[in-house]
From Swiss-Prot:
GO CC list: cytoplasm
Species whose genome carries this gene: Francisella philomiragia subsp. philomiragia (strain ATCC 25017 / CCUG 19701 / FSC 153 / O#319-036)
Sequence ranges assigned to domain TGS in this UniProt record: 1-61
Subunit-level organization: Homodimer.
Protein name, entry field: Threonine--tRNA ligase
Keywords assigned by UniProt, alphabetized: Aminoacyl-tRNA synthetase, ATP-binding, Cytoplasm, Ligase, Metal-binding, Nucleotide-binding, Protein biosynthesis, RNA-binding, tRNA-binding, Zinc
Pfam families: HGTP_anticodon, TGS, tRNA-synt_2b, tRNA_SAD
Function: Catalyzes the attachment of threonine to tRNA(Thr) in a two-step reaction: L-threonine is first activated by ATP to form Thr-AMP and then transferred to the acceptor end of tRNA(Thr). Also edits incorrectly charged L-seryl-tRNA(Thr).
Entry keyword annotation includes Nucleotide-binding: yes
Region (Catalytic): 242-533
This enzyme's EC code(s): 6.1.1.3
Example of a GO biological process term: threonyl-tRNA aminoacylation
Length: 635
């Protein structure tokens, strides 16, 4: 007999050789139906893995985040299974889980389109209904290569050849279909019930444009049909709110192949940009952050010292000049440290807070680029705080307070906080990481801020607090970060003199509140479906006359609005008033001022909102006061 300890502390005896699925069934048949995996002594395992020793066990169900990931990854394999049955000559490549779903890349010998997805999905449902048991076997590297070579799966062979010699290789099988995978998977295809294939896209093998273009099929998978239906409805809403479409319709920005992944900002877009940047500049000043500006390009030796060259080189753009190697910065922190290093600092000077709207460039794969949400060049609202270890918690609390304030002002009232812990690829020793992670936990605990832990998700130089914002249709966006760093100040020679006259290395706190301004503006556009709050919208008021007889009065009203700090647009075109109203309504201008003979004679304005609500007539002075009151209140 073996002893199994459960998360609630209870211990039960089972026969040796039992598996997690059987244990779940012994507790409740309904629990077994939704069990898709388990943590056995904190190791993620398949639900049918045999247990022969005393252990701690946590069952994973489809209600858990990990359970959904297992379900979705299994659905990706179900997709590959269906494709191989329908298109036997197709080669399969990779099929990872992504947010809310999965994708799988295929090398088809024939051309397929969106219309083929329904047939593939139908076959997936047929396979799932068979309820084929899913199992795996561990094989040697040589046997795995031989197995997939025999099947003509050259991409799988390529993957296996790059697997380190000491890494375990598993082949999962369901029915007649086998695939390479680390797992875990659901116990049976019958567990995969609520899924939908959503779109096709192209993707280069291994993200390299020199390689073959593959066909990527995206899908989503959920625990229940109700969850799936809710998500599909959200997708419909998201389609309507797509910032790329709205950005084009409102003349905010555009992209073109001459500069892939880098936005061309138009006047209307720059107006929003300025409001966001000016707001953050004022917030930084309020919270004691001075502003700096540092070089975009630095000698490659700086990036070697900072650790970026060894940990981040594949994402960096490099260049050469006069026989010197340079890199365009992927992050702002090393150049900020250089500003700190220009002076001697005493413990009395700390904390020293520096903010920078720094442009960074990252060599993101072309297939991952997505409008403003994933770009190769963006401006980060970075802040770097140099402080003594005993000041860390107080500084983190202050930054958390600033983040909460900023998000609420921009209309995000629902957000969660997470702590991303040490990744596998990192600098610094475990003792330093232990101390860093505990400091962030202490700061949040002291401020009564609830948080989740994200193992392995920290930056290579330190753990970080993440702020995840929920938008108007329920999507979660990872936005701001607060990162604790003991390593970089030391590597770059940052010091201060302590009260005993000794040199010490300061702790460096990296923080970004809105993060990438490009991405944050994209989030705002989708959150508000283009109907931005008055204080953010590019044009706040459109002034128009019923006929050209009102042109002079329209000009006067327009100038008065401008003098009162209102962003107004004057429309004197010789068009029908209905046409003008429709056009400015489509452009999401919040307020329309319509002037006719009566308004001109009384020197008043008639105002309507872009949604058609009539606010009636008022003096221009009252209208300006009304607008400025809303702007001040961030409405």
């Amino acid at each position: 007999m073996i002893n199994i300890k459960f998360p609630d502390g209870s211990i039960r005896e089972f026969e040796s050789g039992v598996n997690s699925l059987q244990i779940a069934k012994s507790i409740s048949p309904s629990l077994a139906k939704i069990t898709v995996g388990a943590y056995i002594d904190n190791k993620l395992s398949d639900a049918k893995d045999v247990i022969n020793h005393d252990c701690e066990l946590r069952l994973i169900t489809t209600k858990d985040t990990e359970g959904l990931e297992i379900l979705r990854h299994s659905c990706a394999h179900l997709l590959a299974n269906a494709v191989k049955e329908l298109y036997p000559n197709t080669e399969v490549t990779i099929g990872p889980v992504i947010d809310n779903g999965f994708y799988y890349d295929f090398s088809f010998k024939e051309t397929i389109g969106e219309a083929d997805l329904a047939n593939i999905e139908k076959r997936m449902k047929e396979i799932a209904k068979k309820g084929s048991s899913i199992s795996y076997k561990v094989v040697s590297k040589e046997d795995a290569i031989a197995f997939f070579k025999a099947q003509g799966e050259n991409y799988k062979v390529d993957i296996i050849e790059s697997i380190p010699a000491d890494q375990q290789i598993k082949i999962y099988t369901q029915g007649d279909f086998s695939d390479l995978c680390r797992g875990p998977h659901v116990p049976s295809t019958a567990a995969i019930k609520a899924f939908k294939l959503t779109k096709l896209a192209g993707a280069y093998w291994r993200g390299d444009s020199n390689n073959e273009m593959l066909t990527r099929i995206y899908g989503t998978c959920w625990a229940t049909k109700e969850d799936l239906d809710q998500y599909l409805h959200m997708l419909e809403e998201a389609e309507k709110r797509d910032h790329r479409k709205i950005g084009k319709a409102l003349d905010l920005f555009h992209f073109q192949e001459d500069s892939p992944g880098i936005a061309f900002w138009h006047d209307n877009g720059v107006r929003i940009w300025r409001e966001v940047e000016d707001y953050m500049r004022a917030s930084n000043k309020k919270y004691g952050c001075g502003e700096i500006r540092t070089p975009l390009i630095a000698d490659f030796s700086l990036w070697e010292k900072s650790g970026h060259a060894s940990k981040y080189a594949e994402n960096m753009f490099a260049t050469k000049s006069e026989n010197r190697d340079f890199a365009i910065r992927p992050m702002n922190c090393p150049t900020c440290v250089q500003v700190y290093n220009t002076k001697l600092h005493s413990y009395r000077d700390l904390p020293i807070r520096m903010a920078e709207f720094g442009i960074v460039h990252r060599n993101e794969p072309s297939g991952s680029l997505h409008g403003l949400m994933r770009v190769r060049s963006f401006t980060q609202d970075d802040g770097h705080i140099f402080c003594a270890p005993e000041q860390v918690e107080e500084e983190v609390i202050l930054m958390v307070k600033q983040c909460f304030e900023v998000y609420k002002d921009f209309g995000f009232n629902d957000f969660t906080v997470k702590i991303a812990l040490r990744p596998e690829n990192r600098i610094g020793n475990d003792e330093t990481w232990d101390k860093s992670e505990q400091m962030l936990k202490n700061a949040l605990d002291a401020n009564n801020v609830a948080y989740e832990l994200l193992p392995g998700e920290g930056a290579f130089y330190g753990p970080k607090i993440e702020f995840h914002l929920k938008d108007a249709i329920g999507r979660s966006w990872q936005c701001g970060t607060i990162q604790l760093d003991f390593s970089m100040p030391d590597r770059l020679g940052a010091t201060y003199i302590d009260k005993n006259g000794n040199k010490q290395v300061p702790v460096m706190l990296h923080r970004a509140i809105v993060g990438s301004l490009e991405r944050f503006i994209g989030m705002l556009i989708e959150h508000y479906a283009g109907n931005m709050p008055l204080w953010l919208t590019p044009v706040q008021v459109a002034v128009m006359g019923i006929s050209n007889h009102q042109d002079e009065y329209c000009q006067k009203v327009f100038e008065t609005l401008e003098k009162n700090g209102i962003r107004a647009k004057l429309d004197l075109r010789n068009e029908k008033i209905g046409f003008k109203i429709r056009e400015h309504t489509l452009l999401r201008v919040p307020y329309l001022v319509i002037l006719g003979k009566s308004e001109q004679e009384q020197e008043i304005v008639t105002v309507r909102k872009h949604n058609g609500e009539d606010l009636g007539q008022m003096s221009i002075g009252d209208f300006c006061a009304f607008l400025n009151e809303q702007i001040e209140a961030k409405k």
